Amino acid sequence: MTVQTSKNPQVDIAEDNAFFPSEYSLSQYTSPVSDLDGVDYPKPYRGKHKILVIAADERYLPTDNGKLFSTGNHPIETLLPLYHLHAAGFEFEVATISGLMTKFEYWAMPHKDEKVMPFFEQHKSLFRNPKKLADVVASLNADSEYAAIFVPGGHGALIGLPESQDVAAALQWAIKNDRFVISLCHGPAAFLALRHGDNPLNGYSICAFPDAADKQTPEIGYMPGHLTWYFGEELKKMGMNIINDDITGRVHKDRKLLTGDSPFAANALGKLAAQEMLAAYAG
């Protein structure tokens, strides 16, 4: 007998009119074990350079009908790339716009994964006690030890990051100082912070979560309503080229901008980022 799971968004009782994804959508798009593999870096980096993670600090995303989507950073999209980078020898720091704790879509956590969960527990304090991004930006110069900026996905990246001057300043610093920028899924929404000023990403190509897919998610109860705007449309307006229109786990490299299309790309993006950064810093 087949058990039918509900496509109705699940109530988040921590906030008025807020919702988690439906049981059905979680059954289709989350797993208790990740697809982490290929973590093989026999000559890891041993230097001082590290990763700056710009994480989400807000949980609730308004939709077109007034309902709130309970979101944050997607755990797979955050932890798998970092797992690879850490195994390759690169430590990381976490910053949020406010300096308040990172918000995760904990309903997508691979809670039975025997590699990812210990890694998360080992680094949980970094996410619970992040730096304030403005303080990091104020300290940036040509000799700063950050080798890359990583913006994880999850719909939480749509909240605050696209309007942040601190995000813009961090990205401008990274591109102008020949550092890597790594992102996937909804994370590239952070690039919109560059649209009202100096935009060094003009003309770059990326993979990202397609707007067309976002428009379909309410049908299965992943979100409780439609988005009020679509980040892909806005990225194209600022001169960026999104090369995918579907979700296949694709990754892409354009100079030192490394991107992936969805959580299905998280492992491949981690491998790509680790390989590229090892070639640049440990070659």
UniProtKB/Swiss-Prot annotation:
Description of what induces expression: By heat shock.
InterPro entries xref list: Class_I_gatase-like, HchA, Prot/Nucl_acid_deglycase
GO biological process, one term: DNA repair
Catalytic residues, chain numbering: 185
Keywords: Chaperone, Cytoplasm, DNA damage, DNA repair, Hydrolase, Lyase, Metal-binding, Stress response, Zinc
Thermal response of activity: Optimum temperature for glyoxalase activity is around 37 degrees Celsius. Optimum temperature for aminopeptidase activity is around 43 degrees Celsius.
Reaction(s) catalysed by this chain's protein: methylglyoxal + H2O = (R)-lactate + H(+); N(omega)-(1-hydroxy-2-oxopropyl)-L-arginyl-[protein] + H2O = lactate + L-arginyl-[protein] + H(+); N(6)-(1-hydroxy-2-oxopropyl)-L-lysyl-[protein] + H2O = lactate + L-lysyl-[protein] + H(+); S-(1-hydroxy-2-oxopropyl)-L-cysteinyl-[protein] + H2O = lactate + L-cysteinyl-[protein] + H(+)
Protein EC: 3.1.2.-, 3.5.1.-, 3.5.1.124, 4.2.1.130
Residues noted as binding Zn(2+) in the record, renumbered to the chain: 86, 91, 123
Record text on subunit structure and interactions: Homodimer.
Role played: Protein and nucleotide deglycase that catalyzes the deglycation of the Maillard adducts formed between amino groups of proteins or nucleotides and reactive carbonyl groups of glyoxals. Thus, functions as a protein deglycase that repairs methylglyoxal- and glyoxal-glycated proteins, and releases repaired proteins and lactate or glycolate, respectively. Deglycates cysteine, arginine and lysine residues in proteins, and thus reactivates these proteins by reversing glycation by glyoxals.
Name of the protein: Protein/nucleic acid deglycase 1
Lineage per the UniProt record: Bacteria, Pseudomonadati, Pseudomonadota, Gammaproteobacteria, Enterobacterales
